[in-house]
Amino acid sequence: MNYLRHVLPPVIIALAFGALSNTPAQPDTKIVVERIEPSKLDELINDKDCQCLVVAMAAWCGPCREELPTLIKLNDKYKDQGLKMIGISLDMGGPQAMQPIVETLGVNFPVYWAGEEAIYKYDVIAMPTLFLVKNGEIVERIVGKRSEAFLDEKIRDLLR
C-alpha cells in the first residue's frame, strides 16, 4: 500500500501530461476586428495595384460562418500570388460581434467592422457577398455561399 502511494502520483501526472500533449491546439490568430472609417475602406478597396476579394459578412449569418473555412484555405493558397483578401463585418453589435468567430476559425486575413453604413454604400442585399476587385474597380459581385471550386476559379481569373 505504501508502495502505491509513492508510485501512483507520478504515474498519474505522466499520464495527464501525455493526454494533454495530444490535445489539438486552437487556431492561433492575430487578427483583431477593428472599426474602419468609410474613407479608409475605400482606400483599401480602390488600390489601383491590388487584386482583392472583399467579403461582406456577419457573425449571425450561418452561410458566412460556413464559407469562412473555404476562404481561409483560398487565402493561404493565393496570398503569395497577389491576392488581398479583406473581411468586412456588417454586424450591428460592433467589432466585438465578429471577433469570437475570427478567433475560433483562425481567420488569416484582416477583418474590419464597417457596420450598417457599408450595407448601403456597397449595396449589400444578402450575405455573404463577395466583391472581386481588380485595379480599384469592382469587377464582380458574388451573392451567397459558393463552393470552393467556384471561388477558386473566380480567384484564378482575378489574378490573371
Language-model features: where?
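N-terminal targeting signals for export/organelle localization
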Residues: M1-R35, R141, D152, R160
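A short beta-strand-turn-helix
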Residues: I31-C52
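Short pre-active-site segment immediately N-terminal to redox-active cysteine/selenocysteine motifs
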Residues: D49-C52, A56-W60, A126
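Hydrophobic beta-strand anchors of alpha/beta hydrolase catalytic cores
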Residues: L53-V54, M85, L130
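Conserved redox-active cysteine motifs that mediate thiol-disulfide chemistry
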Residues: A56-K73
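Thiol-based oxidoreductase modules, predominantly thioredoxin-like and allied folds used
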Residues: G82-Q96, V107-E116
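Short, internal strand/loop/helix patches
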Residues: V102-K134
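Non-catalytic, surface beta->alpha helical segment in thiol-disulfide oxidoreductase systems
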Residues: I125-A126, F131-R160
